[in-house]
């Protein structure tokens, strides 16, 4: 297994979609995407080598872990490094580099080089020695022996690779093609460090983590850019069944379903949650391990801080919330979109009675609480009275509308 630290835009961004379409592969979803319209098989061959690495510009070239090093240590190092740098802008243009086409900086090169050098030094103790390359200058060979990569320090050259080696006669047409393809997207903010992983030798690299830099002019890290979907509903409405239905059908979309942390056994109920004792929950809550927490019906519920990381990565995050905690949730996630899943009182009563977990008085109390709730004006309402697939397909369509659509032809 090898790791690499790259410049890469968030997966939901237009620049990522354009770059992935150019290469014919999305390294976040780890799947092929359609190449631009009109490309030939020979054109596809020209980008195949770059596609294995995903859309990126190198900061720290691929490295294996040194003995005793761990992926967790790499994550921690990147988080520390990210707090030393603020976001900045990068203006790119199609150009050639050693005979291949690339997007190269017109401005911002010195800031990228500084970031690349810092990444190289910070990760040095975690990287195993790399094999020496051939065909290098004396200085490049010296750098490769010491740092595992020849293009560092004064030899560093920031670029987003577009093709493999080109015949000189083909270069102008490829540069023109790139200028048209990336038109309107050649100024990019550099917002974070992207950790890519090669699971095994020769495998395609995958984007596995984005670590955000400080916001320009601030001492704060970047906050949410994705979309949080806050799902509510009375007991018996079938929330868990509907979320499970949608989860199966939306695999591969830039959308995640957050597990809840709950003080009840893992075997209780139909929800796939993380079971905690009261003491464990209180400890995590006291140490800020939850992005949001609340109490209801004698249980404690929490959403982990990973939710904010997923939002910062530009993902759609679906959480199973509580109507009582909605005001608190809005404070934590101002841009959330609420969804109220419900059913008719008769259906709710029948479902609650069938599961046999509540007494008749408990059922009556739950129905009364549900009847008293008025969804806010910005809340999507979904009625789950009939077959699961009916409301399920409606939910899938609504959630899909919040996901970016991969570019299939340009």
Swiss-Prot record:
Residue ranges the record marks as coiled coil: none
GO molecular function: ATP binding; ribose 1,5-bisphosphate phosphokinase activity
Reaction(s) this enzyme catalyzes, per UniProt: alpha-D-ribose 1,5-bisphosphate + ATP = 5-phospho-alpha-D-ribose 1-diphosphate + ADP
Region (Ribose 1,5-bisphosphokinase): 221-410
Claim: ATP-binding is one of the keywords in the record: yes
Residue ranges of the region described as unknown: 1-220
E.C. number: 2.7.4.23
Pathway field: Metabolic intermediate biosynthesis; 5-phospho-alpha-D-ribose 1-diphosphate biosynthesis; 5-phospho-alpha-D-ribose 1-diphosphate from D-ribose 5-phosphate (route II): step 3/3
Keywords: ATP-binding, Nucleotide-binding, Transferase
GO terms classed as biological process: 5-phosphoribose 1-diphosphate biosynthetic process; organic phosphonate metabolic process
Enzyme class, spelled out: transferase
Positions bound to ATP: 233-240
Family: In the C-terminal section; belongs to the ribose 1,5-bisphosphokinase family.
General function of this protein: Catalyzes the phosphorylation of ribose 1,5-bisphosphate to 5-phospho-D-ribosyl alpha-1-diphosphate (PRPP).
Protein known as: Ribose 1,5-bisphosphate phosphokinase PhnN
Species annotation: Laribacter hongkongensis (strain HLHK9)
